[in-house]
Swiss-Prot record:
This is Small ribosomal subunit protein uS11. Gene3D superfamilies: Ribosomal protein S11. GO terms for cellular component: ribonucleoprotein complex; ribosome. It comes from the Bacteria. Located on the platform of the 30S subunit, it bridges several disparate RNA helices of the 16S rRNA. Forms part of the Shine-Dalgarno cleft in the 70S ribosome. Pfam families: Ribosomal_S11. Part of the 30S ribosomal subunit. Interacts with proteins S7 and S18. Binds to IF-3. Coiled coil: none annotated. One of its GO terms (biological process) is translation. Belongs to the universal ribosomal protein uS11 family. Keywords: Ribonucleoprotein, Ribosomal protein, RNA-binding, rRNA-binding. It comes from Corynebacterium urealyticum (strain ATCC 43042 / DSM 7109).
Length: 135
């Protein structure tokens, strides 16, 4: 006969948080019309920390505000500084409203901003854009 299952809860097995010692890296800010996502990586491209407007606690149309982008960038910067990050090069993508605010809040959080590059993809007359909104 099979042994009865124990009712004791088992400890959750997950990835152990490894503290990396990375002093400089890249910060990628993707700012769309609906959300802002900030990812901070080491120079090889491995993600150290990330945050988005939705993860910080905003829902719906408030995710697209500059204030939500500011809090997301501060959250990502704080997590990265726990791993020893001091200097970042910033790559900004997208047309959203949180671009400049996110860059500013990275520097006010304590990270030294090196270069700032706009890597927004520009189509060579690719896909047809969505139709204009009539409000």
């Amino acid at each position: 006969m099979a042994a009865p299952k124990s009712t004791a809860t088992r400890a959750r097995r997950g990835r152990r948080v490894v503290k990396k010692n990375v002093t400089q890296g890249h910060a990628y800010i993707k700012s769309t019309f609906n959300n802002t996502i900030v990812s901070i990586t080491d120079p090889k491209g491995h993600v150290i920390s990330w945050a988005s407007s939705g993860q910080v606690g905003f829902k719906g149309s408030r995710k697209s505000t500059p204030f939500a982008a500011q809090l997301a960038a501060e959250s990502a910067a704080r997590k990265a500084m726990e791993h020893g990050m001091k200097k970042v090069d910033v790559f900004v993508k997208g047309p959203g409203s949180g671009r400049e605010t996110a860059i500013r809040s990275l520097s006010t959080a304590g990270l030294e901003v090196g270069t700032i590059a706009d890597v927004t993809p520009q189509p060579h007359n690719g896909c047809r854009p969505p139709k204009r909104r009539r409000v």
